[in-house]
Regions:
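Glycine-rich, acidic/polar active-site loops that bind/position phosphate-bearing ligands
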Residues: 2-191
């Protein structure tokens, strides 16, 4: 099984990097300790999709300790091609129905490990996406952002970014609201 790479360009396995200053061992060790004390029983291994939603895998604490902490996890490249209704869209060079929806490796960025206040006994770790040779998936939103930050820094700029949170409150049921949906894609119209 492939070893996880942390905080690219570091290529050391998780258990073989005590001197690398780019690895936040304290966060990884704190997460392992919290799982051992049953303070965390679920770990969300996630990456942002093209709409900024968290995609990934929910794993149990014991499975995280036995496998994920050392090897990371895999997810289907399909997740980078879907619209808001989770319908795969055509025209992607990375992956498609014609090329196949291969898996990519989700390499944990341990600097992002944190407990979630809104989910009891749950931690979250943001991952970088890699192909089967350990190369970054250039079309992944997090990789695109990292490249833009590098470009800005090369020009002497320090990017400062904020996000906007939007939501809707509706006075109807899911069924009546669904009938009124205008989809973002003709492929995902309600039936």
């Amino acid at each position: 099984m492939k070893e996880t790479k942390l905080n690219r360009p570091v290529a050391a396995p998780v258990n073989n990097h005590p001197t690398d200053p780019k690895i936040n061992l304290s966060k990884l060790n704190a997460l392992k300790e919290a799982i051992g004390k049953n303070e965390v029983d679920t770990v969300l291994m996630v990456f942002p999709d093209m709409q900024g939603r968290w995609m990934g895998k929910r794993v149990t604490g014991p499975f995280f300790l036995d496998s994920v902490a050392r090897h990371g996890v895999h997810a289907c490249s399909y997740l980078l091609t879907v619209d808001m209704e989770m319908e795969p869209l055509p025209g992607f060079k990375l992956t498609s129905w014609d090329r196949g929806y291969q898996d990519f490796h989700m390499a944990p960025d341990w600097n992002t490990a944190r407990n979630l206040a809104w989910l009891e006994k749950t931690a979250l770790v943001i991952c970088d996406l890699e192909d089967d040779r350990g190369r970054p998936i250039e079309a992944a939103p997090r990789q695109i952002l990292l490249k833009q930050i590098e470009r800005a820094r090369a020009k002497g700029c320090l990017p400062m970014i904020g996000s906007e949170l939007e939501f809707y409150l509706l006075r109807e049921t899911y069924d009546t609201a669904r009938k009124k949906i205008t989809t973002t894609s003709p492929c995902s119209a309600p039936t």
